[in-house]
């Protein structure tokens, strides 16, 4: 039993390392393309944005296939979070709102009608509820898993780091008053788009790692 557990753990770590290696390799590979090719690949609705959305859908499929229904229902907020990430990638938070449901201007602007404001508040409350449930119910397991170097929690930690990095890079010049060269802007965009694609990859590893752990 112990040997089997060690084998599965090592195999899962290999998956995690391979995924991280893939992300860094894609970043390095994209720097070899010229500016026009990079622009086409990284454009809104382009290859990498589409792949990111498909990967979130793949995560939902993995949950349905690999997890028992009891876990799916009791941890419904995890599936909801993945759906929210997919909708965010498709810019649904901006497409149907004047300023964007995640922007403070949405709740104080005179341009926002009362019905839209009420819908925005409901959506925001739902998002905050999902995040609160995850923090309250998964916090202890997450911390213990990271301390014990469990593959599923390490994958989630990697996804959190990717979220922080990509959100920091997004609008970096505006946020921090940094002037980037055209080459610097393209490299930042590469990191942002590939990093965003890496988030559902890490989610998928976490989902599969949970299943592997319970098969031992």
Locations of regions flagged by a protein language model:
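Membrane-proximal helix-loop-helix units in multi-pass membrane proteins
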Residues: 90-147
């Amino acid at each position: 039993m112990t040997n089997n557990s060690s084998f599965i753990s090592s195999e899962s770590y290999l998956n995690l390392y391979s995924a991280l290696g893939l992300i860094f390799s894609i970043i390095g590979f994209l720097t070899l393309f010229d500016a026009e090719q990079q622009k086409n690949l990284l454009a809104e609705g382009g290859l990498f944005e589409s792949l990111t959305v498909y990967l979130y859908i793949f995560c939902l499929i993995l949950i349905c296939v690999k997890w028992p229904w009891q876990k799916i229902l009791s941890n419904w907020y995890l599936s909801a979070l993945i759906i929210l990430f997919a909708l965010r990638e498709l810019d649904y938070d901006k497409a149907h709102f004047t300023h964007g449901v995640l922007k403070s201007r949405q709740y104080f602007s005179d341009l926002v009608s009362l019905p839209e404001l009420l819908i925005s508040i409901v959506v925001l409350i739902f998002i905050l509820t999902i995040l609160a449930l995850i923090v309250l119910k998964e916090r202890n397991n997450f911390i213990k898993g990271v301390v014990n170097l469990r593959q599923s929690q390490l994958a989630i930690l990697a996804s959190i780091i990717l979220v922080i990095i990509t959100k920091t890079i997004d609008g970096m010049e505006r946020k921090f008053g940094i002037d980037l060269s055209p080459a610097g802007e393209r490299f930042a965009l590469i990191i942002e788009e590939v990093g965003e694609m890496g988030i559902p990859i890490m989610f998928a590893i976490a989902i599969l790692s949970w299943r592997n752990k319970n098969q031992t």
